[in-house]
Amino acid sequence: MSEVANEASRRRTFAIISHPDAGKTTLTEKLLLFGGAIQMAGSVKGRKAARHATSDWMALEKERGISVTSSVMQFPYEGKIVNLLDTPGHADFGEDTYRVLTAVDSALMVIDVAKGVEERTIKLMEVCRLRDTPIMTFINKLDREGKDPIELLDEVETVLGIQCAPVTWPIGMGQRLKGVVHLLTGEVHLYEPGRNFTRQDSTIFPSIDAPGLAEKIGAQMLAELRDELDLVQGASHPFDLDAYRAGKQTPVFFGSGVNNFGVQPLLDFFVEHAPPPQARTTTGRVIAPEENKLTGFVFKIQANMDPQHRDRVAFMRICSGRFSAGMKTFHVRTGKDMKLANALTFMASDREIAAEAWPGDVIGIHNHGTISIGDTFTEGEAVTFTGIPNFAPELFRRARLRDPLKLKQLQKGLAQLSEEGATQFFRPLTSNDLILGAVGVLQFDVAAYRLKDEYGVEATFEQVSVSTARWVHCSNEKKLEEFREKNALNLALDAAGHLVYLAPTRVNLQLAQERSPDVRFSATREAAHTVSVG
């Protein structure tokens, strides 16, 4: 086996998806704790607590207690290298989350035991479906009262349309929680609450027949457990590796992230069964991870990870070959060579210069406005990875400046925020308005906060009569020019210089489409096909 193939086979790159408040950031912390990446997990709950959660590093996130930006963390575990991409927990952050899911090989779905499958989980699951992403499920907050576990499995199967294969099973819940049984090994892990900031190895009995277990959990509970296990093993699906890797079955674990309980069986199972990096499609061919030449694509751009340095970092997922510090690469969209000098590896906000990286790893490249989301880097081959979209925003606001002299800073700030993909920025052809588009309201708060915090610009966002946006394309130049002349009042350029139709109403959009049958109106745009500005 080549060195590239060997290193690729050790990688496990995944994201955690959940509805807000299901405990995703806490679970992220605990996985890092068990992986030895952090000594002490920061609790997410206390907003004013001295120790903030490791993965929530932007000041706004620290104030609000939600993950606004997706960060990347790497840790070694049991001979494997785990790359965990944290996704925003708040309901608004659809696009960024979608793009993160294009950069992973599997996902972990977190469900609150009391709430079951929630709306955001359904949406994220649809995204995973598009790519048949393998998913494991962690049913969290077992230390609180919640739904019956059998009912929960039924709900996941019915609502999300995926077969469940329980791997651990709870012994009680809430006040009566005593532990979990590992259905594949037969081991019983006892619940010992309280030591939630340090790594906790629970007491393990080899089976439910082990002497001393009845004294620990009570004879009646043990009898109930035997009956329940008979029922579960008779009614549920056994774990099937092929079905899981095809995205048709989800192995299910129960636990309490905040109490470090049930996390270790999940992590052990994950590194053993989750897929290593997979082959990926480009415009020219399919690229296998074990190929010797480096390829990778940018799925996210983050500005000002270090406020002292006003920097922008492009996050690149390596798809094949070996990255080494300072190597020369080919930036496919611009057709230019680019030296990747001080590339970074991540442990949330702690950044280290990457000496080398392998398929499945994510590196950060310093970016001065030349790199866009969706860009592909190779060692010379002109291919582009596909499937990294921009979505048409659903909400629009006009930016208003408190100080008109700061227009230049405002334009620069909006262009950079748009380059990250958190919000989109449109400049109408016939006015000087600056219009921002987003998938959710919170993104406008984030934009206003970051403009003030990072660019020194105080801006407000007011309502604007735009209901939806569509990118417009036409292969016939003459017809496109006619369309531009007739519809100039509704046309704008996005931050990458593409023509966009801003419709005041859905009816207006429908009429425009009917009147111009030769023009294609798209709700998404492949991020790779951008023309960078600034």
UniProtKB/Swiss-Prot annotation:
Pfam families tied to this protein: EF-G_D2, GTP_EFTU, RF3_C
Residues the entry annotates as binding GTP: 18-25, 86-90, 140-143
UniProt-listed InterPro entries: EF-G-like_DII (IPR053905), EFG_III/V (IPR035647), G_TR_CS (IPR031157), P-loop_NTPase (IPR027417), PrfC (IPR004548), RF3_C (IPR032090), RF3_dom_3_sf (IPR038467), RF3_GTP-bd (IPR041732)
Function (record text): Increases the formation of ribosomal termination complexes and stimulates activities of RF-1 and RF-2. It binds guanine nucleotides and has strong preference for UGA stop codons. It may interact directly with the ribosome. The stimulation of RF-1 and RF-2 is significantly reduced by GTP and GDP, but not by GMP.
Family per record: Belongs to the TRAFAC class translation factor GTPase superfamily. Classic translation factor GTPase family. PrfC subfamily.
NCBIfam families per the UniProt record, alphabetical: prfC, PRK00741.1, small_GTP
Protein name: Peptide chain release factor 3
Taxonomy of the source species: Bacteria, Pseudomonadati, Pseudomonadota, Gammaproteobacteria, Lysobacterales
